[in-house]
């Protein structure tokens, strides 16, 4: 999965997919009442990027729905996965469950069209704080109560705080999550970060008894760091330059080992070599 980083304006969806992304990451900011409000990152952000592009969250969802609904004039068949980077740092810990409920209602109405031929992309809810694990239950309970438990087949989870792998496993246990887990690791492109924890996550994924199904690394903008990430065995790389990742994947060393994921590739299944 080539994951376009910080795609917060509707116009950027086409821009990143046309550069080779089959997945996008979108920031979600919340108001004081734990309502998802804007797709907005703010300052500071990655070097070389504008941090200030935004939409109202519900408007972005409608644009995303158009891009991921077959038959729509805006449909992009390659776009199969969306990571919502949930900026829950602005919330109190006791608002996490409420944020999950409200997120579920927004997605149900504006993205899934109340279960009636909505967008088809797989969704990863990425949470920065392990203490906010109740967001998951708020989300899953609400979709079930609203009569659409089948949509949970399309939803996975990520804790993005670079916490110790054991602590992340514990948070999932508390949240009652037993699958659909992506594990992120990374840092802004302005700084360097080694691959130690990525390798640990990959080992957990491949052990057959870990909690992780997929591992992605962010933010990867250079050919050398792309090669390092692929060599470490990641399933996805998040990038500001999807075309750079595409170029590396076409190199002799990688083109027979890796290919771009399609809609037929289940993002919740651990890939067996």
From Swiss-Prot:
Residues bound to Mg(2+): 25, 27, 85
Catalytic activity: an N-(acyl)-sphingosylphosphocholine = an N-(acyl)-sphingosyl-1,3-cyclic phosphate + choline; an N-(acyl)-sphingosylphosphoethanolamine = an N-(acyl)-sphingosyl-1,3-cyclic phosphate + ethanolamine; a 1-acyl-sn-glycero-3-phosphocholine = a 1-acyl-sn-glycero-2,3-cyclic phosphate + choline; a 1-acyl-sn-glycero-3-phosphoethanolamine = a 1-acyl-sn-glycero-2,3-cyclic phosphate + ethanolamine
Tissue: Expressed by the venom gland.
GO biological process, one term: lipid catabolic process
Gene Ontology cellular-component annotations: extracellular region
Disulfide bonds: 45-51, 47-190
Active-site residues (renumbered): 5, 41 (nucleophile)
InterPro entries (alphabetical): PLC-like_Pdiesterase_TIM-brl (IPR017946)
Pfam family, one: GDPD_2
Keywords: Cytolysis, Dermonecrotic toxin, Disulfide bond, Hemolysis, Lipid degradation, Lipid metabolism, Lyase, Magnesium, Metal-binding, Secreted, Toxin
Cofactor note: Binds 1 Mg(2+) ion per subunit.
Cross-referenced CDD domains: GDPD_like_SMaseD_PLD (cd08576)
EC number: 4.6.1.-
Cofactors, names only: Mg(2+)
GO terms for MF: lyase activity; metal ion binding; phosphoric diester hydrolase activity; toxin activity
Compartments reported by the entry: Secreted
Primary location group: secreted
Family as reported in the entry's similarity comment: Belongs to the arthropod phospholipase D family. Class II subfamily.
Function: Dermonecrotic toxins cleave the phosphodiester linkage between the phosphate and headgroup of certain phospholipids (sphingolipid and lysolipid substrates), forming an alcohol (often choline) and a cyclic phosphate. This toxin acts on sphingomyelin (SM). It may also act on ceramide phosphoethanolamine (CPE), lysophosphatidylcholine (LPC) and lysophosphatidylethanolamine (LPE), but not on lysophosphatidylserine (LPS), and lysophosphatidylglycerol (LPG). It acts by transphosphatidylation, releasing exclusively cyclic phosphate products as second products.
Identification of the protein by name: Dermonecrotic toxin LspaSicTox-alphaIA2iii
UniProt source species: Loxosceles spadicea (Recluse spider)
